[in-house]
């Protein structure tokens, strides 16, 4: 275990503790390193000899096709909870996990092939991800965590991992206010808007300016499972 803080007491003799200000310099001594969200690496991840993973990365690798990943600067806990309850009330086997305060691996035994996993993802969880969920949702982008990222561009780049490693048959649902530049999203983009100045509908069937009716305002479902 590498940590900048010094452990007050070592209760497990089988654990090697590496502490102090240079604790990150030991990473290349290992084949695989699990990184906690929010830790800033000293150099780009591709420059390390070891493979740097996280619990989120491994979980998404294992259950990618079943995951609805939701991120955004504001409102992601509310929307994640809403989506979970919509799925549950419709009779689906749904699981709520992630940055909302529910560690994903604590509920792994509950997952079946039919489980829909609603996963709240923070920028710190997404920052070094090399895999994206089957369905990714980006609600909004505002200036935040710039003490960690330094620039808005780096913060946005972390959020974009919600879709950047998707496949062509995956789905990316995004607010019109934070659509990525044309050509960088490999999956099918479905736009949604909460603005009221337009009454037009999207080709996807989702309606502009209707808030919750973006999902419930049409005769057909916006996304089928």
Residue ranges and their predicted role:
Residues 1-10:
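NAD(P)-binding Rossmann-fold cofactor-contacting core
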Residues 149-156, 187-225:
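Adenine nucleotide phosphate-binding catalytic loops in nucleotide-utilizing enzymes
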Residues 2, 20, 55, 173-175, ...:
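Generic beta-sheet signal
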Residues 24-30, 37-188:
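Phosphate-binding loop of NTP-binding sites
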Residues 11-13, 47-53, 198-200:
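ANL superfamily adenylate-forming
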Residues 9-14, 106-110:
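Active-site-proximal loop->helix
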Residues 2, 32-34:
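A noncatalytic interaction/capping subdomain that flanks phosphate/NTP-handling catalytic cores
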Residues 12-26:
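Glycine-rich, highly charged phosphate/nucleotide-binding loops
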């Amino acid at each position: 275990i590498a940590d900048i803080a010094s452990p007050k007491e070592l209760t497990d003799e089988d654990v090697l503790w590496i502490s102090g200000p240079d604790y990150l310099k030991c990473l290349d001594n290992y084949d695989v390193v699990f990184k906690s969200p929010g830790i800033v690496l000293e150099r780009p991840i591709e420059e390390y000899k070891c493979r740097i993973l996280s619990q989120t990365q491994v979980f998404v690798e294992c259950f990618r096709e079943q995951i609805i990943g939701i991120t955004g600067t504001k409102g992601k806990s509310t929307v994640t909870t809403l989506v979970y309850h919509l799925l549950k009330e419709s009779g689906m086997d749904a699981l709520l996990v992630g940055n909302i305060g529910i560690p994903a691996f604590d509920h792994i035994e509950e997952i079946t092939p039919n489980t829909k996993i609603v996963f709240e993802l923070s920028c710190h969880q997404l920052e070094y991800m090399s895999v994206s969920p089957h369905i990714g949702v980006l609600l909004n982008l505002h200036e935040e965590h710039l003490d960690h990222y330094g620039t808005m561009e780096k913060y946005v780049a972390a959020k974009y991992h919600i879709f950047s490693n998707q496949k062509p048959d995956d789905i990316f649902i995004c607010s019109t206010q934070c659509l990525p530049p044309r050509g960088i999203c490999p999956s099918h983009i479905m736009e949604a808007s909460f603005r009221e100045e337009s009454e037009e509908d999207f080709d996807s069937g989702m309606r502009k300016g209707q808030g919750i009716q973006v999902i419930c305002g049409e005769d057909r479902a916006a996304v089928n499972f």
